[in-house]
Each structure stands twice: as structure tokens, then as C-alpha cells.
Amino acid sequence: MKFSRKLAAVTASAAMLLSACSGSATPAPAASGGGAGASGVTAAGCTVGVSWNNYQEERWAKWDEPAIKKAVEAAGGKYVANDAKSSAETQATNVENLISQGAKVLLILAQDDKAIKPSVATAISNGVPVVAYDRLIEDPGVFYVTFDNVEVGRMQAREIFKAVPKGNYVFIKGNKADANAVFLKSGQDEIIKDAVASGDIKNVGETFTDSWKPELAQTEMEQFLTANNNKVDAVLSENDGMAGGVVAALHGQALDGKVPVSGQDGDAAALNRVALGTQTVDVWKDSRELGKAAGEAAIQLCNNKDVTKIAGASSFTTPGNNKVSSILLKPQPITKANLNVVLDATWITKDKLCAGVTAGSVGGC
């Protein structure tokens, strides 16, 4: 069946599916703006459709979406969005719905980078450019906007290795269907591979975590603690949500604050854990900058559908040996030593950062 016929069939239901995005948070309503964006490119009347994989995660609603929406509307574009609620099948349908609503460019935060490929290929073949947002989609026709996730992994491992150069390590990885989980682990491995080879570091537990769920990470960590009689010296957790689950498991054995734990994303709870000493490092990725870059790239694609012509883009070689045009932003590790960075950037308030922290015990609190 041709894509245009499928779109006709779902047009009438698109609005209902959007309104069905229930839960504590839903994507912001569509709105139109006017004028030129920060990139100097205008796209009056261009609709940018965003497919979120799971809008319930803190950062998407708080940081990423407002930045994308602002960039799109500043250039005169219109923003529409929907939420797949961690379902790859729903996301495929959502992509069709966005196009049926008139989206001229798509931003997709993929739930499953392989499952979404047919929808992406069909969109591109129908003249709708696709931006892979923060998660790689293995298609040379997409434009990829993210942080350097291999470097995120390196940053995590550097801080944990600094704290524990020898000992038993556990690796809590993200969703198996998400290329970022692989990128992060490869960066971590670069830092600790010699210590692993020499036997200084022993891998006593490693697992992927479905949909990066904190509650699953907690269960996984509890199982690794049991299997190793609590003899775990360090945990490389790939993100903050899972780090929260890890710390909860450690707390159950009175090990929180004693076993170094990594994370990333700059979640408020994680930054507070850094201040408290129960999380060693949180690699901060300023999602406001990521959203801005993606929104501006989408606006440029409204005017010129060639993904190789995006300002500031470079070529990125994927694990599948495809070359995609991309923008990779630089992350920053946050530890007790530089908490002032996120305060100065107004990323978090002092009250939230320092909750439960003894005044003067760490910088910024």
C-alpha cells in the first residue's frame, strides 16, 4: 500500500490519537509564530512534527521540547507533537499521523532505532526530511542531532575509575534497541580496558535495561549485589534515571555513598545525589542547546531538504558503517567539585540542588 493512501486513512484519527497521549505530562499544544529564528532562516507556515518516544521522562518536557518549540516558532514555523509511550508500534503510527497533519519535517526520538526505519524511509521517499533527535536512526538520509555520547561514556568512566582504579564493577546499560547504549559503553571501555585486561577491574555484572527504566535498574542492581555478596565496588550506570534505581538498591544494603555511581542527563534528583555524595558524576548535557540546534536544523530543512547542507554539520560514521550528517554537541561532567556550573547556568535552583546537604559541605551549597 502506498504511503499516501495510508495517510488518508489516518487523517481523521490523528487529532484523537494526539489527545490520547495521557499521563502526568503530554506534548505541548501546537502554536504558530513569526519572524526569523536565531539561525536567521525563516519558514513561515512550515509544520515541524515531533515524535517523542516517552514524554514522561523529566528532561523531554522540561528542557528539550520548550527549546525545540521556541526555535521553530521563532522562525515562523508551527510545532506539533505526539507521544509513543515507549511503544515502537505506536511510534510508527504516530509518524504517519504527524505527516497527515501537514508536517513538512520530522524530529524523531526513536523508541527502537530498527523498528522505526521503515517509517523513516517512507517519509524521506515522500519528501519529508527526518531529524534523528538524540538517538541514532541507521539511515544515511536522516540528519542526526545529539551530544557526543561516546565522550559521555568516557567522562563517566574517568570519574568512576579515578575513584575506584581496582575492584568489582557493575555495568547498567540502557535500552538494547538504542544505539546510545552502545556508544556509552564503548566510551567507558576506552577508559578502563587496560585495567580490565590486567585484572585490576573485574566485570561482575552487566545488563541492558528495557526502556532505561529506573525500577528495572534497581531490580538488576539488587540481583548483582546478591550474586556478589554485596562485593561491588563501582557502578557505571548509563543515565540518571537508572542511577536512581541503582542508588536505591545500594541504600537497601547501606552501601549508598560508599559505592561510586555514574549517570548522565542533569536530572535534578541526580544532581542532588552528587551534592549528597550518593552519585559520583552526572554528565550534564544542556538539552536547551540540543533542542535549539534540532529546531533550527528542522527549519533549515523546511527550506532545503538536503541534510548535507545544514549549517555546522559534519559527517558521522555509524556503527552500521553508514555516514550521516550530524551535529554533535559537547557534554560536561558534573561532580562535587563543579556544582556551581549547573547553578550558574540556571539549570537547577540551589534549593533543589542542596536539599538535605549540610551547608558549606560542598561548593554551591
Residue ranges and their predicted role:
Residues 2-6, 12-16, 21-365:
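A residue-level marker of the well-folded mature domains of exported/periplasmic proteins
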